[in-house]
Amino acid sequence: MNEHGFQMQSALDGNYISIALPASCRQDKIAVRVIKESCPEFLLSFGMTDINDRITLKYKVPNAVSLKYMNGSFTKQMFVDFYEGLLEPFVRGYDWFLDYHYVCVIPDYIFVDKQTIRSQFLYIPEQSYRNTDEEIIDFLKNVLNKVMVTDDSAFLVQLYQYFNGGNVVLSDLDNMIKAEKSKISPKPVMQGNTASAV
């Protein structure tokens, strides 16, 4: 992915990422409209400015940690939720007529909510920012190098074996994660004392 033109900016109302698009940019106008009108939760919405035929996209940075700094230990439940969120724009983007090749896979610009473990991505609807399938697969594989699953390390080994098999299909990977999620029994909810005092 093209990393040219990314700039962090601070303002009184928060932090922003600005991306100045090339002068002769070819935008995906359908994607621009979709994101402005009904942006999916896994993407950051953006504003656009056009000054002297130079278009700049401006994304407000959420109160979350950059994937670049996200590492450590996860329970299997947390990891499966986290990884399912990373896959979401690549397997569900077409539901919004979005091409997953334009989802930014640079870890600095992917934001993970510390509470929900869900990720938000930048979508850059311009041809020069298009990822190859190999770049997307490398991104998803490299995330595994930053984490450890404390209660099922064999599952990480299974994922590594899948990637090293060489025939990675995003929908198959998503199905693998969903299958593991269905095997994990939900934690019981603590019930309070429901007896009423007389």
Q: Residue spans of the language-model regions?
A:
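Catalytic core regions of nucleotide second-messenger enzymes
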Residues: 51-55, 96-101
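"Short basic amphipathic alpha-helical interaction patches in structured regions
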Residues: 71-75, 93, 97, 122-125
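Short C-lobe core helix of eukaryotic-like protein kinase catalytic domains
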Residues: 84-95
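A short glycine-rich, hydrophobically flanked beta-strand micro-motif that places a catalytic Asp/Glu
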Residues: 98-112
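Short, Lys/Arg-enriched, disordered terminal segments
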Residues: 1-12, 188-198
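C-lobe/activation-segment region of protein kinase-like
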Residues: 113-197
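Short amphipathic alpha-helical segments
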Residues: 78-86, 132-136
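Conserved structural core of kinase catalytic domains
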Residues: 2-83
